[in-house]
Design a protein with these regions (language model features):
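Short, contiguous, pocket-lining structural segments
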Residues: 4, 33-41, 63, 128
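Short glycine-rich loop/turn motifs
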Residues: 7-8, 42, 99-103
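Single conserved hydrophobic/aromatic residue that forms the stacking wall/gate
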Residues: 1-10
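Structured C-terminal helix/loop/strand segments within mature extracytoplasmic catalytic/sensor domains
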Residues: 48-152
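Flexible glycine/proline-enriched surface loops and loop-helix/loop-strand junctions
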Residues: 23-31
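A short glycine/serine-rich beta->alpha loop
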Residues: 31-33, 120
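Acidic-glycine-rich active-site phosphate/pyrophosphate-binding loop
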Residues: 11-24
Length: 152
């Protein structure tokens, strides 16, 4: 995984998308992937994103609200790797998975949700976390594509 990531960083640098030392960039990314969090932590991260970057418990603004559209767009299009499109079609939720089996998903202005449960599928996403989040989101009406019947 680190070797593939380093190769990706070198490729992005060659195209002018990354400045600086590829080894340092990969080290920083690897350390970010190694941060220990639990489901409650991930849920608070997701809730903060759903609340336009403001922590719903502390009221502290942690992410610039102007950055939220870009963050959610990247989550929607790449957050579940090769299955991002399938996930978005099924749930309508921007999401991000991690190699430890965690997934966060966001219904902007409504809720953020998280689940952790290995094992991973072929795309690198938790099988059970996907199912749990999809089921809970459906029960809460989180998919904006299913918000109202079409043609009525």
């Amino acid at each position: 995984s680190v070797s593939r990531g380093l190769g990706d960083v070198y490729k992005r640098q060659a195209y002018g998308h990354i400045e600086g030392d590829p080894l340092q960039a990969t080290d920083i990314y690897t350390r970010q992937c190694s941060v220990g969090v639990n489901t409650k932590d991930l849920g608070m991260m997701a809730a903060t994103l759903a609340n336009a970057g403001t922590n719903p418990v502390t009221g502290k603004s942690l992410v610039n609200p102007e950055d939220m559209p870009e963050i959610l767009a990247v989550m929607a299009t790449a957050g579940l790797y090769d299955d991002a499109g399938k996930w978005l079609y099924k749930t309508g939720l921007p999401a991000k998975s991690g190699v430890g089996g965690g997934i966060i998903a966001v219904s902007p202005g409504k809720f953020g949700i998280a689940a952790i449960s290995p094992p991973l599928d072929a795309a690198g996403n938790s099988v059970r976390a996907q199912k749990a989040i999809a089921d809970i989101s459906a029960a809460l009406g989180g998919n904006p594509y299913e918000a109202a019947p079409y043609g009525k």
